[in-house]
Amino acid sequence: MSAKPTTLYDKIWNDHLVHEAEDGTCLLYIDRHLVHEVTSPQAFEGLRTAGRKVHAPEKTLAVVDHNVPTTDRSKPNPDPESAEQIAALAENARDFGITYYNEFDKRQGVVHVIGPEQGFTLPGTTIVCGDSHTSTHGAFGALAHGIGTSEVEHVLATQTLIQKKAKNMRVTVDGQLPDGVTAKDVILAIIGEIGTAGGTGYVLEYAGDAIRSLSMEGRMTVCNMSIEGGARAGLIAPDERAYEFLKGRPLAPKGAAWDAALRYWDTLRSDDGAHFDHELKLDAAALPPIVTWGTSPEDVISVTGRVPNPADIADEAKRLSKERALAYMGLTPGTKITDIKIDRMFIGSCTNGRIEDLRAAAKVAEGKTVNANVNAIIVPGSGLVKEQAEAEGLDKIFIKAGFEWREPGCSMCLAMNPDKLAPEERCASTSNRNFEGRQGFKGRTHLVSPAMAAAAAIAGHFVDIRDWH
């Protein structure tokens, strides 16, 4: 009798299941643990108090990213609390024997950029981090998701995690993406379709021609924002594109171990006939460049559209929520998206801070000048991304056009470091969240692709990137 068809999520889950209790609570083995300075101090302190060691330091990688300044690092950190957290991570990594990339190491960067870059992220592995955007690593066919600080301590101590199994959802995007439409637009469109709660209780598997055609950078962008759709994690089955990206990376398998890994990785795809609890299909050809207008990632609209009118929403709670969003964003229903002016622009983050993103922005910026009323910063996702961009001359293009070229870090994605919006400043951002106060107190965030962000910085307002050239 042939085995029951199985989803990719089920395969990875079953390979890592240590124990399942009668109530469905499971103990899962964790292959990789990424650590940063914000969610780890209490976890390490818990280990010290209990007299425990890190169970598998070789499967743990630490990096500073959230609090680190992206300007001159030869000067002291201006925020004492941030400086304390950075110093604590360095001390904890040293005391517990964990590999650590500090702010002066060229391998340093945003945790979800450096994992794949180093080959620490591998197909078929379970990966956790005290950060919600750990779902990024699902682009390689890894089961990856964020955990809380108490869970960080549990994984450090045991290399296992207690959780319940999620349901399966498949999101299929078929067809070819039009010019000017990117992976960022794909995931924003998906979130707009299912809402920020639509993926709750699910692991999303992305499939279809449009997904397969994406670069690894693009796939990481899609999986990165799975959490904004409410999902536990996002997955894309690994293929030759993933293998090519990983081959030769410092921490990837070598020689016979690589060949053995490939044989296993080739099994990591959902079987024909595997059951999904929910299916969603999108037509890639119908997708436009997208701009968010509100304070939730589900508040999406085509760049050619107008700010919607909440009065058209029948559900009272949702209507009031969208009215509040418009008031916070300082927008009027019916306003053309291309008439919305910006004050700031941010290209970077674990969503869009990779070399492909910087190349796309440089293509838009070359020979142009940033609008006099806009402050625009570009923050590479890692020191190695920065090094590669500079080798390609992208930094010169940006600086000549009037963009600020920064050091790697989380930067303006979140208001935990000096890169913040002032109250009521409006930002075109390539990050992943547009919540109230996310980029600074009363700051106004519009989520867009790197090319759309660069074009807005130059024009001073949102423009349809399809008309740019």
Curated annotation (Swiss-Prot):
Annotated metabolic or biological route of this protein: Amino-acid biosynthesis; L-leucine biosynthesis; L-leucine from 3-methyl-2-oxobutanoate: step 2/4
Family matches, as PROSITE patterns: ACONITASE_1 (PS00450), ACONITASE_2 (PS01244)
Keywords: 4Fe-4S, Amino-acid biosynthesis, Branched-chain amino acid biosynthesis, Iron, Iron-sulfur, Leucine biosynthesis, Lyase, Metal-binding
Co-factor remark: Binds 1 [4Fe-4S] cluster per subunit.
Keyword Metal-binding in annotation: yes
Pfam families in the record: Aconitase
Catalytic reaction list: (2R,3S)-3-isopropylmalate = (2S)-2-isopropylmalate
Requisite cofactors: [4Fe-4S] cluster
Alphabetized GO MF terms: 3-isopropylmalate dehydratase activity; 4 iron, 4 sulfur cluster binding; metal ion binding
GO biological process terms, semicolon-separated: L-leucine biosynthetic process
Chain positions recorded as [4Fe-4S] cluster binding sites: 350, 410, 413
Record family assignment: Belongs to the aconitase/IPM isomerase family. LeuC type 1 subfamily.
PANTHER family named among the record's database cross-references: 3-ISOPROPYLMALATE DEHYDRATASE, HOMOACONITASE, MITOCHONDRIAL-RELATED
Subunit and interaction comment: Heterodimer of LeuC and LeuD.
Protein name (database record): 3-isopropylmalate dehydratase large subunit
Source organism of this protein record: Rhodopseudomonas palustris (strain ATCC BAA-98 / CGA009)
Lineage of the species this protein comes from: Bacteria, Pseudomonadati, Pseudomonadota, Alphaproteobacteria, Hyphomicrobiales
This protein's encoding gene: leuC
